[in-house]
UniProtKB/Swiss-Prot annotation:
Keywords: Hydrolase, Manganese. Belongs to the metallo-dependent hydrolases superfamily. Adenine deaminase family. HAMAP family: Adenine_deamin. The keyword Cytoplasm does not apply. NCBIfam families: ade. Its EC number is 3.5.4.2. One of its GO terms (molecular function) is adenine deaminase activity. It catalyses: adenine + H2O + H(+) = hypoxanthine + NH4(+). It comes from Listeria monocytogenes serovar 1/2a (strain ATCC BAA-679 / EGD-e). PANTHER family: ADENINE DEAMINASE (PTHR11113:SF2), N-ACETYLGLUCOSAMINE-6-PHOSPHATE DEACETYLASE (PTHR11113). This is Adenine deaminase. It comes from the Bacteria.
Length: 580
């Protein structure tokens, strides 16, 4: 919030007892994130900020905390709103009951489809919600040069967006080879971010401690891609803030939390990165990360520091992350600090959640933000899905449940008539990526293992990060039926059976990424999709749709598929499906 002179004068008057506070919270046990103590005291709030901690006997309104622990609002240090497949305003409705009052988001999903207009849509839609949504401008649109996306964002296109008060830096720099080569465009983006006083986020998936030197040398200071305690420690020692991730697919917290100690915890914070709406509802958001950390040996106050002041320091947000004078009155009441049971949430001094019930009056009723989605533009034919082969020994994308990484496998496959034929008994299925933005006719076809399909196909327009159409199936006919269906609906997800009949779908009319419906409706459709998937697959224990969407992301090891073909992370090049 931007303050004016009158507001500061009113706050000072409250702090020294000359005026009443708007609100005073009494009888709470305040978690001091600076000292690590639990303290007593009244919390006086004026104009959405904390005016003081101490004795404040009078106020316009008093809340009796009745012994609850008082924590700062939780901060998600790195999240892609689009992965929840709802608009920012709907996203806020899910997060606030989980104690999350601030997010730092990278809207590179919608930017890959719609460029600057997509970023502007996200910023505008978030205005109606009692949630701080800070934006890191997408650094890598597209993620690599080896695929087609909807828009390309060079430095000169990004720079004007820094004028927006909610834009605070440059998002995850994924194109590591361009950094290592000193490419002009990525370095210009980094220089612009520095000039604007912004942070620069990293994306160090698979990078060694030696590789990190390139990142640090140009000013990249954060990373959220650690999957082991060693990787987290390497990044810590290099001078980075380390975000410990727990999302839907990227579930890394249990593997990385051993890196946290009493001496170094101030350099760690939490993020979700990508989390589906159903997981946000059933598990939670950053509150779930806190719970997991506590269950795995982290002191509760330390875990709360990681979720609040550490994240604020990481992103240079000086008035967030603490219950102290001069800080924004973003406050979470906890009935139990060990289990992180939330009873009340305040945003800017206003109660937005009470005993799990949202205060809908706190959400500004604004008209839907207009957004004209780019059309889905392709003409794929059945023959385009064929995979000609001359050798039975092929590279196969080995899907790994609950991981963004894949395995570069070598398998013996079946060939009939010079073409690959999926074999259900070996779980060797066909995968295709269809370029959907410019009708280039580009279709990448490969082989994947891990989905356990017995018939049919699934397809989605959510395909990181270029968001072309991706499908996996037992037959070309079923794959085409699924592709055709989501094309007709303007984007989305579909499950079809062996006869090509649609078992369930979810329409995503906003850029093929977001629903225009409530999060409750999206949750119902996701449940329907999962039930439909179970009808055609023997696999379980992971989300097949978000997992599929990451099999197209070439900046995470080891083997991925783009509209240009099979992408090998180790060489950062397109390779043949056949093993030479």
């Amino acid at each position: 919030m931007v303050e004016n002179l009158k507001q500061l004068q009113e706050r000072v008057a409250v702090s020294d007892g000359r005026a009443k506070a708007d609100l005073v919270i009494k009888n709470g046990r305040i978690i001091n994130v600076f000292s690590g103590e639990i303290m007593d005291g009244d919390i006086a709030i004026k104009n959405g900020y904390i005016a003081g901690i101490g004795s404040f006997p009078d106020a316009e309104k008093i809340i009796d905390a009745a012994g609850a622990f008082i924590a700062p609002g939780f901060i998600d240090a790195h999240v892609h709103v689009e992965s929840a497949m709802v608009t920012p305003a709907e996203f806020a409705r899910v997060l606030l009951p989980n104690g999350v009052t601030t997010i730092v988001t990278d809207p590179h999903e919608i930017a890959n489809v719609a460029g600057e207009k997509g970023i502007e849509f996200m910023l505008e839609d978030a205005k109606g919600a009692p949630l701080d949504m800070f934006v890191m401008l997408p650094s890598s649109v597209p993620a690599t040069e080896g695929e087609h996306n909807g828009e390309t964002l060079h430095a000169e296109k990004l720079h004007p967006l820094y004028r927006h008060e909610k834009v605070i830096g440059l998002a995850e720099v994924m194109d590591f080879p361009s950094v290592a080569k000193g490419s002009d465009d990525i370095l210009r983006k980094i220089i612009d971010a520095k000039k604007e006083g912004g942070r620069i986020d990293g994306h160090g998936a698979g990078l060694t401690s030696a590789d990190l030197n390139n990142y640090l040398a140009v000013g990249i200071r954060t990373d959220h891609e650690s999957t082991t305690a060693k990787e987290a420690t390497d990044r810590l020692r290099a001078g980075m803030f380390v975000m410990l991730r727990e999302g839907t697919v990227g579930r890394d917290l249990l593997q990385t939390i051993p890196a946290v100690s009493e001496k170094n915890s101030h350099r760690f914070c939490f993020c979700t990165d990508d989390k589906l709406i159903n997981d946000l509802i059933t598990e939670g958001s950053i509150n779930y990360n806190i719970k997991l950390a506590i269950k795995n040996g982290i002191d509760p106050i330390t875990a709360i520091q990681m979720a609040t002041i550490n994240a604020a320091n990481c992103h240079n947000l000086p008035y967030l992350g603490a219950v102290a004078a001069g800080y924004q009155a973003d406050i979470v009441f906890l009935t139990d600090i060990e289990t992180v049971e939330i009873s009340k949430v305040l945003k800017n001094g206003e109660v937005v959640v009470d005993n799990g019930v949202r205060n809908e009056a706190a959400f500004k009723q604004q008209a839907a933000v207009p957004f004209v989605s780019p059309p889905i533009n392709h003409h794929v034919h059945l023959q385009d899905l064929a995979l000609p082969l001359t050798k039975e020994t092929c590279y196969v994308i080995g899907m790994q449940p609950n991981s963004l990484f894949t395995e570069k496998r070598i398998e013996q496959v079946t060939i009939q008539g010079g073409k690959f034929v999926p074999t259900v008994e070996n779980d060797l299925l066909k995968m295709a990526v269809v370029e959907r933005h410019h009708d280039t006719g580009c279709v990448g076809v490969g082989i994947v293992k891990g989905f356990g399909l017995t018939e049919g196909a699934i397809a989605t327009t959510v395909a990181h990060d270029s968001h072309n159409i991706v499908a996996v199936g037992v037959s070309d006919e079923a794959m085409k039926a699924a592709i055709d269906h989501i094309t007709q609906t303007g984007g989305g997800i579909a499950v079809v059976n062996g006869a090509g009949q649609v078992l369930h779908d979810l329409a995503l009319p906003i850029a093929g990424l977001l629903s225009d419906k409530s999060y409750e409706e999206v949750e119902n459709d996701l449940a329907g999709l999962l039930n439909a998937f179970k009808q055609i697959s023997t696999a379980n224990g992971f989300d097949p749709f978000l997992t599929l969407s990451f099999l197209t992301l070439p900046v995470i090891p080891e083997l991925k598929l783009t509209d240009q073909g099979l992408f090998d992370f180790a060489t950062f090049q397109i390779i043949s499906n056949e093993v030479n």
